[in-house]
Swiss-Prot record:
GO terms for cellular component: extracellular region; membrane; other organism cell membrane
Keyword annotations of the record: Amidation, Amphibian defense peptide, Antibiotic, Antimicrobial, Cleavage on pair of basic residues, Immunity, Innate immunity, Membrane, Secreted, Signal, Target cell membrane, Target membrane
Propeptide: 23-48
UniProt-recorded name of the protein: Medusin-S1
Domain of life assignment: Eukaryota
One Pfam family linked to the record: FSAP_sig_propep
Principal place of residence: secreted
Stretch forming the signal peptide: 1-22
GO biological process, one term: defense response to bacterium
Subcellular location: Secreted; Target cell membrane
Keyword Membrane included in the entry's annotation: yes
InterPro entries (alphabetical): Frog_antimicrobial_propeptide
């Protein structure tokens, strides 16, 4: 009976450790995905701003020609 209790305890303990490791890996994966998504959003904002520069330059040059 003592052997069965020890075996059951060992199985439960190892299962708990395995579950904890899986949850930690899942959390790390989600954090990496969130960081990558944030980077993509920042790059798209930068591209949008860089795309507006030629428009702003042409508007300024048109205004300077008028004045």
């Amino acid at each position: 009976m003592s052997f069965l209790k020890k075996s059951l305890f060992l199985v439960l303990f190892l299962g708990f450790v395995s579950l904890s490791i899986c949850e930690e890996e899942k959390r790390e994966t989600e954090e990496k995905e969130n960081e990558q998504e944030d980077d993509r959003e920042e790059r798209s904002e930068e591209k949008r701003l860089l795309g507006m520069i030629p428009v702003a330059i042409s508007a300024i040059s048109a205004l300077s020609k008028l004045g």
